[in-house]
């Protein structure tokens, strides 16, 4: 059983090495300029692809359609309140060499399993996994509906099937670098299209006014739309699933390997400090990208759909959302919206499936079914997951055929998981990191306030959604 006492503060390098997180011979000094830092960024690109597909195009625009501009404050808070957790959980992972599931398995409160003891958050993660698959089915279904806008003769279920095949082919190699390259194209495409759409809207009758923006900061909360608002909170910005998957992308980008095993030396501290700066830059880029994607979709939903009475629901959700473009730019823009929606939703599907494959071998290891030194088995599981799970998404979509409902279910579960993650991050930092590697006072205080806020939000989700 793992020790979790304060004496562990200098033990972050004393576990048996995990060659997944720290391959041999990759210790490297950090870059010393902004331009040299750029080539070491990348996890933000993958996580941004995951973020915008679910919360932004479906839930954020839907919330704007329902309430207008009055909950702009809520959307911004949902975007920005979780980045501190993203940064601080990643801090622990890259310094310790733990994977995400290895980290949460260090929390006190052990449960006896068939192969030994494990911590209670492991069970919560497993319980959240199925709703996450449901959300993935909603994303690929939404991508199929986007294709159907310009090719209405194509049956959506058949399009989902084709996308499942393409996803399996793309992810069959399990390569991080291949995934990063694919996501970069998608992220650049949908970010440019989304920002352009908002700019074009300003030349129409739906142009956003200063008064409308001001109404978004009256801090009004429309309780009749609480379920949708809380779902948007759960999935807008980095949600709990994306926060955890971000740590795996940091591992595969090589941050823990370049920092190296903790030895208490000044050289290690200098490397760790430098690579943490790279990590923070990557987190800031994530927040910038998701803000550029979120606000335009909320404004389009509030300015166009709310004013015209359109409501994106059920199997016609993506078609209703396309009204944001066609009403402001003309019928030709249906192709523009379809391309943007497809890039957003399908990139989220690919990134979500790729992330899911990283959890499975870790679960097997933490539950005692697989040795941690079997990096070869880990890689094979990741590949097979990428080949099989896209067809699970196809099956789930065939059963629901309602992207908004499917994503709302997953988003509600994601919101409930946030206080668990923030509480665990506070615990792990305070008990297992050297004092000189802890966050500053401001960041530490903000993380604790975030934990309390996430706790309140989780209670509201349980009250409005579950009960």
Model-assigned labels for residue ranges:
Residues 20, 60-62, 87-116, 145-148, ...:
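Flexible loop linkers connecting adjacent transmembrane helices
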């Amino acid at each position: 059983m793992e020790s979790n006492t304060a004496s562990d503060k200098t033990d972050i390098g004393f576990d048996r090495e995990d060659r997944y997180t720290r391959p041999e011979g990759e210790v490297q000094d950090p870059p010393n300029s902004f331009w040299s830092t750029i080539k070491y960024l990348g996890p933000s690109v993958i996580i941004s692809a995951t973020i915008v597909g679910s919360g932004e195009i479906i839930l954020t625009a839907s919330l704007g359609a329902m309430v207008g501009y009055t909950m702009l404050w809520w959307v911004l808070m949902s975007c920005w309140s979780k980045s501190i957790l993203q940064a601080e959980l990643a801090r622990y992972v890259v310094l310790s060499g733990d994977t995400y599931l290895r980290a949460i398995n260090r929390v006190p409160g052990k449960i006896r399993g068939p192969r030994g003891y494990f911590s209670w958050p492991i069970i919560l993660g497993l319980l959240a996994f199925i709703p996450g698959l449901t959300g993935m089915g909603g994303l690929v279904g939404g991508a199929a509906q986007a294709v159907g806008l310009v090719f209405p003769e194509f049956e959506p279920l058949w399009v989902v099937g084709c996308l499942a095949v393409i996803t399996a082919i793309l992810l069959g190699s399990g390569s991080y670098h291949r995934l990063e390259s694919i996501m970069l194209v998608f992220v650049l495409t949908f970010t440019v299209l989304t920002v352009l759409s908002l700019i074009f809207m300003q030349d129409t009758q739906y142009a956003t006014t200063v008064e409308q923006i001001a109404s978004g900061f009256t801090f009004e909360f429309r309780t009749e739309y609480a379920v949708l608002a809380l779902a948007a909170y759960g999935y807008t910005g980095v949600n709990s699933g994306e926060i955890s998957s971000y740590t795996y992308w940091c591992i595969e980008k090589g941050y823990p390997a370049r920092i190296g095993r903790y030895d208490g030396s000044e050289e290690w501290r200098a490397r760790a400090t430098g690579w943490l700066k790279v990590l923070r830059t990557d987190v800031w880029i994530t927040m910038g990208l998701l803000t550029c994607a979120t606000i335009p979709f909320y404004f389009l939903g509030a300015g166009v759909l709310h004013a015209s009475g359109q409501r994106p629901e059920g199997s016609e959700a993506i078609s209703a959302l396309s009204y944001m473009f066609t009403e402001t730019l003309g019928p030709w823009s249906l192709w523009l919206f379809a391309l943007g929606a497809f890039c957003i939703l399908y990139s989220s599907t690919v990134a979500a499936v790729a992330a899911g494959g990283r959890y499975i071998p870790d679960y097997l290891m933490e539950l005692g079914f697989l040795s941690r030194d079997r990096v070869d088995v880990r890689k094979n599981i990741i590949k097979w997951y990428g080949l099989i799970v896209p067809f699970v998404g196809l099956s789930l979509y065939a059963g629901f055929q309602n992207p908004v409902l499917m994503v709302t279910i997953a988003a509600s579960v994601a919101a409930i998981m946030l206080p668990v993650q923030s509480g665990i991050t506070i615990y792990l930092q305070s008990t297992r990191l050297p004092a000189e590697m802890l966050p500053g006072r401001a960041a530490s205080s903000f993380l604790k306030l975030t934990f309390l806020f996430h706790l309140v939000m989780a209670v509201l989700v349980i009250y409005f959604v579950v009960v």
